[in-house]
UniProtKB/Swiss-Prot annotation:
Gene Ontology cellular component terms for the protein in this record: plasma membrane
HAMAP family xref list: KdpA
Gene: kdpA
Function of the protein: Part of the high-affinity ATP-driven potassium transport (or Kdp) system, which catalyzes the hydrolysis of ATP coupled with the electrogenic transport of potassium into the cytoplasm. This subunit binds the extracellular potassium ions and delivers the ions to the membrane domain of KdpB through an intramembrane tunnel.
Subcellular location: Cell membrane
Subunit details: The system is composed of three essential subunits: KdpA, KdpB and KdpC.
Protein's name in the database: Potassium-transporting ATPase potassium-binding subunit
Record has Cell wall biogenesis/degradation as a keyword: no
Length: 579
């Protein structure tokens, strides 16, 4: 257990040390201030504005900003859909991969445009290098930038007084990609290449096995095909942008995507780096760092508790494992605990940390198979997604989702003391409350409706590899992942079918854009308001009491929404294992 504590402490320390300066840097980018990269990138930025006829002085209303977000996303979806369909005719396809089915193309286009990266296929066998690079990798950049841009708009809504505009979407997305995502991705890509992650355009290589194996039918296998490709560049942004879609089917459990313990560290820190940094950006730009720290602490407390629960449950294992008497013991030669579905080179601590990080953020990349976790160890990642991906969450969307919960929290507090609620010096009125409820409830609606329909359809039930509580957990996890814009999976059933592809695709669209539009509506309403002077009756939103209230509201909504479903899935499985 000491190993768990030390590793957890190290990961969090590195994360915070890197996130604070990055948060200040991102704050400067939002405000258009000069940074150390300005001399290099400003000419590129101005060139983009010129060729696209972008008016740098335009300040958009929330409705125009929303229209721009939707228009950009729709165009991205159409282009990515067509890339999937026609990839067999496009270049950089050394393995001669044909186009995908229309329903898989529909699902995957939505998946990457919404920053979910749910994958019902294996990339190395289903997609060409061109589709991976020009389709998926491009969307990894711009879908992440869309989320950050919407957060910028919301922050402006709080800091501006009696205005109409909340910024310019085209400027926000351009600056986010140019100044934040590309530089960070270059650094992480080079770090990954140094550890052996592949980055080339070669054909797949056939190599001889060190130990030939005999299949059940008696066939002797002496060779294996090793997939190659431009993986490192895609992996870097899949982590930094909380995208999560793997170049390979097994994601970062694959030794070509994640070969060493150092590559694992780089990828895991990258996963939460920007979501954590944005908390400090928020505090800096509203000119009250305590507000950003309060939200960071609330998120951090929930993250650490989740890490502890997953780590302890995976180290202890199941009651059946405990009959061994030794399986939970960690020694210098073995990780102990529940090692099913985990890479021996990573062990319990690193695998459980990644599982917690990737579901706290709306990332979804994996270095172990969540379906093989213990019932409670698998339930916590599911619950983190069901809370609305607000425990840091995706880049931009996690923080604006948590701000939605903060608005609910101050409203509840205002009801208790009989005052009009205020947040960051502005009154919270009925319109903001309606939009905040929309932001907070979109995820539960998408998850529960989708999983409920799928669970009663014979084609889903018949395709399950596991029956009973665990089978239901697999379906619930799939729609939780889609509704949380996460993208990870328990797997365990046929995911690449027309119904699953379409229904999960619709869940991803709903869960991405409904909260986003609600957030922009809040920004548009707030930007018109004047600041209200603090008084003795004003609820402080930066102290321990508010942090506790915020955590309570997040958990209350999550518990009320999902406890019945969790009781039928992982909780029932836990008690079944107890005998």
């Amino acid at each position: 257990m000491m190993n768990l504590v030390l590793q957890y402490g190290l990961y969090i320390l590195i994360l915070v040390v890197l996130a604070i300066p990055l948060g200040n840097y991102i704050g400067k980018i939002m405000n258009g201030e000069k940074v150390f990269l300005s001399k290099i990138l400003t000419p590129c930025e101005n060139f983009i504005y010129k060729i696209l006829h972008i008016d740098k002085d335009e300040d958009m209303s929330w409705k125009k900003y929303s229209f721009s977000v939707l228009a950009f996303s729709i165009i991205s979806l159409i282009v990515l859909f067509l890339l999937h369909i026609f990839q067999g005719f496009l270049p950089l396809n050394p393995e001669k991969v044909s186009g995908t089915s229309w329903d898989l193309a529909f699902n995957n286009a939505i998946s990457f445009v919404t920053n979910t990266n749910w994958q019902g296929y294996s990339g190395e066998s289903s997609l060409s290098y061109f589709t991976q690079m020009m389709g998926l990798t491009v969307q990894n950049f711009v879908s992440a930038a869309v989320g950050i841009s919407v957060l910028f708009a919301l922050i402006r809504g709080f800091i501006r007084v009696k205005q109409k505009g909340i910024g310019n979407f085209w400027i926000d997305i351009t600056r986010t990609v140019l100044y934040i995502l590309i530089p960070l991705s270059i650094v992480v890509s080079l770090a990954l290449v140094s550890q052996g992650v592949v980055q080339n355009f070669k054909q797949y290589e056939t190599v001889s096995l060190l130990e030939p194996i005999t299949l059940e039918d008696g066939t002797l296998v002496t060779e294996e095909v090793v997939p190659l490709g431009p993986a490192a560049s895609q992996i870097a942004i899949k982590q930094l942008g909380t995208n999560g879609g793997g170049f390979m089917g097994t994601n970062s459990a694959h030794p070509i995507e994640n070969p060493t313990i150092l590559s694992n560290l780089f990828e895991m820190i990258s996963l939460l780096l920007i979501p954590v940094a944005l908390c400090f950006t928020f505090g800096r730009n509203i000119k009250d760092r305590r507000q950003g720290i309060a939200i960071f602490v609330a998120m951090g407390i929930m993250l650490v508790v989740a890490m502890a629960i997953v780590g302890v449950n995976e180290q202890i294992g199941t009651p059946q494992m405990a009959l061994n008497g030794q399986v939970d013991l960690s020694t210098i030669n073995q990780a102990g605990g529940n090692m099913e579905g985990k890479e021996a080179r990573f062990g319990i601590a690193t695998s459980s940390t990644w599982a917690t990080f990737t579901t706290a953020a709306s990332n979804g990349s994996v270095n172990s198979m969540h379906d093989s976790y213990t019932p409670i160890g698998g339930m916590i990642p599911m619950l983190l997604m069901q809370l609305g991906e607000v425990v840091f969450g995706g880049v931009g969307c996690g923080l604006y989702g948590m701000i939605g919960f903060a608005i609910l929290a101050v409203f509840m507090a205002g009801l208790m003391v009989g005052r009009t609620p205020e947040y960051l010096g502005k009154k919270i009125e009925p319109f903001e409350m309606k939009m905040a409820v929309l932001v907070c409830l979109a995820t539960p609606i998408a998850i529960l409706i989708g999983s409920g329909i799928a669970s009663i359809l014979p084609e889903t039930v018949n395709s399950l590899n596991n029956s009973g509580a665990h089978g239901f957990s697999e379906v619930l996890y799939a729609y939780t992942s889609a509704g949380g814009n996460n993208g990870s999976a328990f797997a365990g059933f046929a995911a690449n079918t027309p119904f699953i592809n379409i229904s999960i695709g619709l869940s991803m669209i709903f869960a991405r854009f409904v909260p986003m539009m609600g957030t922009l509506a809040i920004a548009g309403s707030m930007v018109k308001k004047k600041k209200v002077a603090e008084s003795v009756g004003t609820l402080p939103t930066h102290n321990a009491m508010f942090i506790g209230l915020l955590i309570f509201v997040v958990l209350l909504i999550g518990a009320l929404s999902f406890f019945p479903a969790l009781a039928l899935g992982p909780i029932a499985e836990f008690f079944q294992m107890l005998g």
